[in-house]
Amino acid sequence: MTTPTANGGMGFEQGQNDLCLFFNPITLMRIACHVDDILARGNREESTKFWNAVDAKFGLKEWHICEYDNPISYLSLRIKVQDRDGVDWYSIDQSQDLAQFIVDEGMANIRPVSAPMPDRKELLSNPKEVSITEHKWIRSTVGSLSYFATHSRPDIAYEVNRVSQCLEKPTQGTILAVRRIIAYIAGTLDFQLEAPRVKGTDWHLYSDSDHAGDRAINGTKSVTGVVFLCNGMPIHWRSKKQPATSTSSAAAEIYAFSEAVRDAQVRFFIAEEMGIKVKYPIEIFIDNAAGVSFQRCTNPDTQIKGVFDLRDEWVRELRNSKKVSAMKVDTAKNIVDMMTKCLSATVRERLMFELSAIAREIARKHLGGT
């Protein structure tokens, strides 16, 4: 595949930041490979030519082109394209696998709930120990939930991360919490990641932290939340306990901010290798004034003196090279809140609306869509 076209090859170049990605600088076609599963992105003519060439050499089991009413499946991800008022929208979901997962867990008739973990109490509601059989079930089920939370369900990332902290010594409360997450999934099987099909690329990066807000599970450690959007679609997210105790909320926010910058850099390196234009500086949205101050003026004499480490110099270099720019966002509109704390159904619904509004605004800006 990487043999030059002059020598009878396809002319693809292998990515240096992700060896599973290939890019053709002439046709602008992009390929993602995972073992024997291949996903190709390009125009119809080049895609057909590519698949015919691969089929002739290796004998493909099957291949499909994503079209209206003809979704494709890649690594259990269902990818669709739909026409909405003259605008093409891409969507990604795992609804079929999630539905089967619920059936396999024997919960096909479970009553749906509107929030996976509306407060912190349920996980601690029953301290009674679990049996060996229940312990095995918890570990297996949380493992499956982690897979879905990582690939297509950012809306359960925090809750799954939280129950994962209890795998060593789970209780009956852990079982209740896991069952509630499944009940939430049962009521949101139609959840999907969406983005309009536009020529340009808009990037949005959000970071947040919850400073020692869950001491029963995380002790004095804070939680970092990061969401990275491409044209309004989440392409990377994580909810993770910070490795060290932060002495203040400012320190926790700065740690989350620097983690977001690091994540963004990796994705931008890959995007640039694949021929995707990246507009600098990277705008990172945070709802903490200390985080904004840290990015704009990393100086030991500032109002947040005493919370720095080596990230100080690193962020200063990125700022001076105009690679990053911190933007203040209203806490009520900070979509990454769902990665750092338990939320009520009302707050969760509002943040999901804010997430979809970003994609709709991008569609309007580029295409005049709705």
Q: Which positions does each model-derived feature cover?
A:
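Mobile genetic element proteins and their domesticated derivatives, centered on retroelements
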Residues: 1, 7, 21, 36-38, ...
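Structured nucleic-acid-interacting core domains from mobile-element enzymes and related host factors
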Residues: 183-211, 276-278
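RNase H-like nuclease fold core
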Residues: 145, 205-252
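C-terminal reverse transcriptase regions that engage the nucleic-acid substrate
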Residues: 69-190, 330, 340
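RNase H-like nuclease module associated with reverse transcription
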Residues: 166, 202, 243-370
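Catalytic palm subdomain of template-directed nucleic-acid polymerases
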Residues: 24-59, 77-93, 165-172, 290-304
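Catalytic palm active-site di-aspartate
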Residues: 14-42, 68-80, 98, 144, ...
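Active-site palm subdomain of RNA-directed nucleic acid polymerases
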Residues: 1-35, 40-42, 47-51, 57-64, ...
